[in-house]
Design a protein with these regions (language model features):
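A cross-kingdom marker for long, charged
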Residues: 191, 195-218
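N-terminal pre-catalytic segment of deacetylase/amide-hydrolase enzymes
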Residues: 1-56, 211-213, 219-226
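Acidic, His- and aromatic-enriched active-site or binding-groove loops in soluble protein domains
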Residues: 109, 182-191
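Short, electropositive alpha-helical surface patch
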Residues: 168-184
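Short phosphate-binding/catalytic loops that engage adenosine nucleotides
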Residues: 32, 80, 182
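Metal-dependent polysaccharide deacetylase catalytic core of the NodB/CE4 family, i.e.
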Residues: 3-7, 47, 53-56, 64-66, ...
Length: 226
């Protein structure tokens, strides 16, 4: 999972466009198939019989404006599918985020899938401590449901995959997400996805600009999706 992009490393979550391009080239040269995340989920739940091996999926969380300015040109150049996990409260509101029009524009490429990251990216552990059990339950429902509804309304896409903010999840959150209509969800637990992994807590590697050369090789080495 990536977050932000740019010509230089602006913060701990920024990967330079040069570094991202080197990642894509490494994958190409190594024979890795970059597949839509949906294919991985469908395989995991038995709706798809096979995947290319080795393969992986690329995801980007949050909806930072650098996805539009810096990442999208590379997505088009290399024709790679990417899943964006968005929290709608920021879109067209926060100065760091993309706009709905920008999302619709890049959507026409057919290379991007838009999925949910809650409504405003809360820390569920903190909210649980602050709120009464009833208020917390209502808060969770709002975060999961409102995000799904807003994304589907604005982008006309089916939203049934979820990225847990800060990688925080538990059985109660999973139960509520399934109730609302999510069929899979993703963490930031650093290991390769296995058939035995729970579909509502599938792992992902958090990628930073430090993941270059041998470090990036360690992330992807020996990662067949079957």
């Amino acid at each position: 999972v990536y977050h932000r992009f740019g010509p230089v490393v602006a913060d701990g979550m920024t990967v330079t466009t040069r570094q991202f391009e080197s990642h894509v080239k490494y994958l190409r040269e190594g024979g890795y198939a970059v597949i839509p995340l949906r294919h991985l989920v469908d395989y995991h739940i038995g709706k798809r019989k096979a995947l290319p091996s080795p393969c992986l999926a690329i995801t980007v969380d949050d909806g930072h404006k650098s996805v539009y300015t810096d990442l999208f040109p590379l997505i088009k150049k290399y024709k790679i599918p990417v899943t964006l996990f968005l929290y709608p409260s920021a879109i067209s509101n926060a100065s760091y985020a993309m706009t709905w029009d920008q999302l619709r524009e890049i959507q026409t490429s057919g290379l991007l899938d838009f999925q949910g990251h809650t409504y405003w990216h809360p820390n569920f552990k903190h909210e649980r401590k602050k709120l009464s059990p009833r208020d917390y339950e209502n808060f969770v429902e709002m975060q999961l449901k409102k995000s799904k509804e807003k994304l589907e309304k604005e982008l006309g896409t089916k939203v049934d995959m979820l990225s847990w903010p800060f990688g925080i999840y538990d059985e109660e959150l999973i139960r509520k997400a399934v109730e609302i209509g999510y069929v899979s969800a993703f963490t930031i637990e650093r290991h390769h996805a296995k058939p035995s992994d729970p579909v509502m807590a599938l792992p992902r590697y958090l990628i930073t600009d430090a993941d270059q050369g041998k470090a990036f090789e360690k992330v992807v080495r020996g990662s067949p999706c079957s």
